[in-house]
């Protein structure tokens, strides 16, 4: 007779890590060239002046400057980087 109960192993207990999407630099914050401003899926926010878009729709700064968010019309948001020299 067994003195211990046989214990089965569970097949649960795993989960994938979150994608860490969202705004990484806020309005008025200083960014350097190449800094990620927004990580997103699809173009929720569109690139404006001095902002590039990556293959996974990540928006990044092309020059050093300050982040500026704007609305274009009713349903389009853009993000710009205003160079520090122009301020």
UniProtKB/Swiss-Prot annotation:
It comes from the Bacteria. Keywords: Ribonucleoprotein, Ribosomal protein. One of its GO terms (molecular function) is structural constituent of ribosome. Gene3D superfamilies: 2.40.50.100. One of its GO terms (cellular component) is cytosolic large ribosomal subunit. SUPFAM superfamilies: Ribosomal L27 protein-like. The keyword Ribonucleoprotein applies. InterPro entries: Ribosomal_bL27 (IPR001684), Ribosomal_bL27_CS (IPR018261). GO terms for biological process: translation. Residues 1-21 are annotated as: Disordered. Belongs to the bacterial ribosomal protein bL27 family. NCBIfam families: L27 (TIGR00062). This is Large ribosomal subunit protein bL27. It comes from Desulforudis audaxviator (strain MP104C). The lineage of its organism: Bacteria, Bacillati, Bacillota, Clostridia, Thermoanaerobacterales. The gene is rpmA.
């Amino acid at each position: 007779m067994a003195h211990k109960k046989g214990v089965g192993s569970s097949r649960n207990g795993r989960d994938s890590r979150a994608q860490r999407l969202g705004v990484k630099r806020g309005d008025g914050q200083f960014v350097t060239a190449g800094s990620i401003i927004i990580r997103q899926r699809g173009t929720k926010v569109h690139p404006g002046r001095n902002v590039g878009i990556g293959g996974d729709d990540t928006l990044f700064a092309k020059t050093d400057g300050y982040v500026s968010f704007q609305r274009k019309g009713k349903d389009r948001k853009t993000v710009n980087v205003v160079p520090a020299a122009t301020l």
